[in-house]
Amino acid sequence: MNKEQLEKMKNGKGFIAALDQSGGSTPKALKEYGVNEDQYSNEDEMFQLVHDMRTRVVTSPSFSPDKILGAILFEQTMDREVEGKYTADYLADKGVVPFLKVDKGLAEEQNGVQLMKPIDNLDSLLDRANERHIFGTKMRSNILELNEQGIKDVVEQQFEVAKQIIAKGLVPIIEPEVNINAKDKAEIEKVLKAELKKGLDSLNADQLVMLKLTIPTEANLYKDLAEHPNVVRIVVLSGGYSREKANELLKDNAELIASFSRALASDLRAGQSKEEFDKALGDAVESIYDASVNKN
């Protein structure tokens, strides 16, 4: 593990850019960017277009390591190059810590939750991540209803996989998303917090994780989890809120920083000039940084 990157993730001021839309969500991400499905005829062309978009983001002067601590990549992006370097090396050289999305998507809903599908190639994927100088990973589950068994299952699965990731020398981001429209959201979050605490308490002193959570209904609910010795940092997802709303809610949570995807890229368009693109990205970065650093 790179100690300098660990220090940056633990104490740096800023947020994490989530650039990890995978195969399923790529057409939607491209459409929002202004690239329609008739502009590519197969998956390779689609992934090249999305890589071009991500390249435009990470090479922009607005994508500044003074504001952006890390970036989460999709497997395809890890294996591609930006300006002649593998993406993770390009980011690390720029001062941005690289993470890799490792999950294979969500299973069918059961007990009010969606567990992760089995990650059958996890070992070899983590070996490749190490070869590509990736610092950490990210994997997402989804909680839709107040169901204690379901929430327990989500957290247990996350920690089980997290321990395999830690064993390979990487720092896992555990992401049990709570749907922002869930009927008993505040109650779900209390149960989730208790289960996360159990999981964290089961780790050895040298087993470090990060958490990526939905912004809690009760402000500062996760404060003591953020202070847990095994937690490097807690980041939050925008989860369907507009950027303005997500930023507003984030400002009320002292220990949390953003890890936004859609809310970061929502004003970026393929047809923008370099100046327009850099300004739109810069405005987004500035506002998300502000919400991550300057608290109410």
From Swiss-Prot:
Output one GO BP term.
Answer: glycolytic process
Q: Which organism is this entry from?
A: Staphylococcus aureus (strain MRSA252)
Protein's UniProt name: Fructose-bisphosphate aldolase class 1
Which controlled-vocabulary keywords does the entry list? Glycolysis, Lyase, Schiff base
Check the record and name the Gene3D superfamilies matching this protein.
Aldolase class I (3.20.20.70)
One term of GO molecular function: fructose-bisphosphate aldolase activity
Reaction equations catalysed: beta-D-fructose 1,6-bisphosphate = D-glyceraldehyde 3-phosphate + dihydroxyacetone phosphate
User: EC annotation?
Assistant: 4.1.2.13
For this UniProt entry, which segments traverse the membrane? none
The family annotation for this protein states: Belongs to the class I fructose-bisphosphate aldolase family.
Q: What class of enzyme is it?
A: lyase
What pathway, per the record?
Carbohydrate degradation; glycolysis; D-glyceraldehyde 3-phosphate and glycerone phosphate from D-glucose: step 4/4
HAMAP family to which the protein is assigned, alphabetical: FBP_aldolase_1
InterPro entries hit by this protein: Aldolase_TIM, FBA_I, FBA_I_Gram+-type
Looking up PANTHER family in the UniProt record yields: FRUCTOSE-BISPHOSPHATE ALDOLASE
Active site (catalytic residues): E175 (proton acceptor), K212 (schiff-base intermediate with dihydroxyacetone-p)
